[in-house]
């Protein structure tokens, strides 16, 4: 009886572990820029052509974990050179649904925003975050295991 019980438990745990999917780790390789991109908010500069595009993001706010919908998708490209990291971001949304709120620096408020966190120690625990809202308010943060 005990042997059958252990066999059933083993089979159940095996099925449960197979049923759980491990999320795929997404990575975007930055491309070394041959020339400095023009910083004007218009992403038609030739330097961006052929650079890999990151898509299929997951929301943090207002619904954590919700996958983006095509009509409100975000596309990111990253370049770098000896002096800077350049990020191109295209955020698709109906203009009348973009939430803008003019607040002080380092205060995101309830506005729509985009941010990047660089895992500068490559340890998954420490990093530096840079954010900007739809109204142009900037926010930066340092993340660590100890707060």
What are these regions (language model features)?
Residues 2-11:
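Sec-dependent signal peptide recognition
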Residues 20-147:
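Structural preference for beta-rich elements and adjacent junctions enriched in aromatics
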Residues 14-16:
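N-terminal signal peptide c-region/cleavage motif recognized by signal peptidases
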């Amino acid at each position: 009886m005990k042997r059958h019980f252990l066999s059933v438990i083993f089979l159940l745990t095996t099925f449960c572990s197979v049923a759980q999917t491990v999320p795929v780790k997404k990575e975007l390789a930055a491309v070394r820029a041959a020339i400095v991109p023009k910083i004007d908010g218009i992403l038609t500069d030739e330097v961006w052509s052929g650079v890999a595009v990151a898509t299929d993001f997951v929301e943090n706010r207002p619904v954590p974990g919700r996958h983006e919908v095509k009509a409100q998708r975000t596309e990111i490209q990253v370049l770098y050179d000896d002096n800077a990291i350049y990020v191109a971001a295209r955020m698709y949304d109906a203009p009348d649904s973009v939430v803008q709120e003019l607040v002080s620096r380092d205060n995101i408020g309830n506005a729509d925003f985009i941010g990047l966190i660089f895992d500068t120690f490559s340890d998954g625990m420490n990093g530096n975050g840079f954010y900007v809202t739809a109204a142009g308010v900037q926010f930066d943060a340092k993340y660590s295991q100890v707060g």
